[in-house]
């Protein structure tokens, strides 16, 4: 599973924050290796089948998201590594941004609530960014 959330990272519990920070890089890594296809790509954000494929051409969104996740992890005092791929293609059609719709945010928040750990942790930020 590769989760890409849409809500601000500050809203995520520690478990979801760290998991997304770790999993998000799977998409740019696949693109860097040429192991992706835009065929059958959904036109709208979705969960489940097609979730990852939706983001294959949204590297700008993923980069911004990863930077926000990384900053939030550091602000909470987590020791995390920065693993954004430096070998991504420069094709403009792969570097699209994405502005989540209200419906996409609603779907994402519902999924986060559904998957909230029984003992969710919310470490307070140790520094303002």
Where are these regions (language model features)?
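Extended, charge-rich alpha-helical interface modules
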Residues: 1-129
